[in-house]
Amino acid sequence: TLSYQRDLLKMADYLEENGITDCGKVTKTALNSYILFLEKEGKAASTISRFLASAKSFFGWMFREGKIRRDPADSIHAPKIEKKVPVILTVDEVTRLLEQPSGANPKEIRDKAMLELLYATGIRVTELVGLKLSDVNMSIGFITCRDEHKERMIPFGHAAREALAKYLEAARETFLKGTHSELLFTNYSGREMSRQGFWKMLKGYADEAGIQRDITP
């Protein structure tokens, strides 16, 4: 059908722009990246579902015909974007809070990245402190959160990407002190931050920003 052809042509254009011109080299990650691209463009869920049906049909046929060695669309699902928790702060208060870590030292660079990422994605604090380096895709701009039942791919914007890039380049090694860690964020001992530790940090910046109300992460 025309819709089927149009879906595949748009996908092919996106993949080609990202250096993938051979169907045999298309991966599940590449298809998930395209789905995130469609979501960022504001495409309706029905449009993304139709693309998935087209992709599954096309790659399933290619696999059955022996034209590709594996079907990248076989187990793919549309990533669910987590709804952000209701914001209890005003826009002005959020702006002031995010401005508090000025980035004058490694701790403030790390804290800035954590606050920006938390605000951009709406994930839970336990998910934030448990993120691994491999959960972050800087080139496309999304994080992957997992639990026992599902995997969520959540996009983030320019401000969070900029803060993360600065942290990874200029501050993360300071906390690791020459050791290795899969964690994205660590404390000064190179270990996972506790939820209480993050709360204490957040409360400190809220006080500096002159925010009187009792906020919780």
Q: What role is predicted for each listed range?
A:
Residues 1-217:
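Conserved catalytic core of the tyrosine transesterase superfamily
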